Design a protein with these regions (language model features):
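Charged, often Cys/His-bearing segments associated with DNA-binding zinc-finger transcription factors
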Residues: 1-47
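Basic, short loop/linker segments at the boundary and entry of helix-turn-helix/winged-helix-like folds
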Residues: 34-73, 80
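Trp/Phe/Arg-rich N-terminal binding region typifying the photolyase-homology
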Residues: 56-70, 81-131
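Mobile genetic element proteins and their domesticated derivatives, centered on retroelements
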Residues: 74, 88, 155, 310, ...
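Active-site- or DNA-interface-adjacent structural scaffold in DNA-acting proteins
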Residues: 105-287
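Active-site cores of enzymes that catalyze phosphoryl transfer or operate on phosphate-rich substrates
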Residues: 276-312
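Electropositive, glycine- and tryptophan-enriched low-complexity nucleic-acid-binding patches
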Residues: 297-343
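Helix-centered, glycine/charged polyanion-binding patches within enzymatic domains
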Residues: 355-382
């Protein structure tokens, strides 16, 4: 295959190496193993991880550029470098250490140009990812290098999603913009007249509102009322088009999903406008699963992303529980202890955790099994 000759696995390269001196590649290998990147590569059991996730070579069709182990290595490399998909491919083409990290050798005359391959690999791994089974593989591999296996440290944190800070006005405007665009598209496809509404007037008012440095609460409330009413009207107009011409239109699954999210946004915004509290508040149209996580920090009172309850074993963190909805980590200390004992096969004798974990149930549990804790004693000292 002509295309596959552009990228080769390193194991296949010895007889046909494109260097004038064979010693050069050996020097590159030696420098790679001595580098920080090489040391990082040596601590991951990539083959076992690929097998656990069910990744395998395709027997039919074109051979993949990246082997199953190399796909996981590429994701580790992306997390390590912090590059975007495009930047990662550009550096992979020109950095031989990055290529060795992924067990490939790229012909300089035929570099990888499709940067979307990184996204495709990420989606494939995400569809097969089972955090618990993968952590068991990593724990068994790292156990010989860890000390203090009897000490369990627990804490909760938030893995923030990269998104702009959400506000009611931004959320309403995104909903209006998307819905109006599709109403116009439906009218063009059907050859019918576009229904009348106040979209352009609201768009001008919103633009003027965004340009102001200081926004009065009365002006914000007035514009929010107009946007809620317009969104309600656009949904009615869209439903009327669907009722009359629904058989002539084709809706994708993403379209239906986005529409249902916008309906929920309208319901929530109407309730908040009259002063009611809303549960499971949507903060992003694209990432409808993200919820506000109240952290109570001085710099950030609210964060947006997945809340995670972690255990730390000799500096290595493992995920005990992950959820995009807020939860009370204080009731999960027993699960943390059981998880560490399962991963390390060593009885936990010491626990260090925040005061939120120091409830009566956890204190009784630790006392019953002889586990010493970092909790402050209850009551007044004698």
């Amino acid at each position: 295959n002509k295309d596959m000759a552009k990228v080769q696995n390193i194991s296949e390269i010895h007889p046909t190496l494109g260097f004038t001196e064979f010693d050069i590649i050996e020097k590159y290998r030696k420098s790679f193993h001595e580098s920080e990147l090489g040391r990082l590569h040596s601590v991951f059991p990539f083959e076992r991880m690929a097998k656990t996730m069910g990744l395998s070579e395709q027997r039919l069709g074109r051979r993949n550029i990246f082997s199953p182990s190399a796909k996981i290595a590429l994701m580790v490399l992306k997390a390590y470098t912090g590059f975007s998909d495009r930047q990662l491919v550009e550096h992979l083409n020109g950095n031989i250490h990055y290529q060795m990290f992924c067990w490939i050798m790229i012909n300089p005359s035929f570099p990888i140009t499709n940067y979307k391959i990184v996204s495709a690999i990420r989606n494939e791994i995400a569809s097969r990812l089972d955090v618990d089974s993968l952590q068991e593989v990593l724990a068994s591999h790292w156990k010989p290098y860890l000390d203090s296996l009897h000490v369990c440290m627990a804490d909760a944190t938030c893995y923030e999603s990269h998104m702009r800070y959400p506000t009611d006005m931004k959320l309403l405007w995104e909903s209006l913009e998307w819905l109006y665009r599709y109403i116009c598209r439906h009218c063009v496809e059907l050859g019918i007249r576009r229904p009348r509404n106040k979209y352009r007037n609201v768009a001008e008012s919103y633009l003027s509102y965004c340009k102001k440095r200081k926004r009065k609460a009365s002006r914000t409330r007035m514009l929010k009322r107009r946007m809620i009413r317009l969104l309600e009207k656009l949904l009615i107009q869209r439903d009327e088009i669907h009722r009359e011409y629904g058989t002539l239109l084709r809706y994708t699954q993403d379209y239906q999903k986005r529409l249902s999210i916008i309906r929920k946004v309208l319901v929530q915004e109407k309730e908040m406008f009259v002063g009611k509290k809303v549960r499971d508040r949507i903060v992003s149209i694209d990432r409808h699963y993200v919820r506000p996580i109240v952290r109570g920090k001085e710099t950030k009172s609210v964060e947006f992303g997945a809340k995670v309850n972690n255990i730390q074993i000799d500096g290595i963190s493992f995920i005990e529980h992950l959820s995009f909805k807020a939860f009370n980590e204080g009731i999960r200390l027993k699960d943390c202890i059981r998880m560490q004992q399962k991963l390390m096969n060593v009885r936990v004798r010491c626990v260090a955790a925040d005061s939120i974990y120091a409830n009566n149930a956890n204190r009784k549990f630790c006392t019953k099994y002889g586990i010493s804790t970092s909790f402050v004693r209850k009551g007044r000292a004698a």
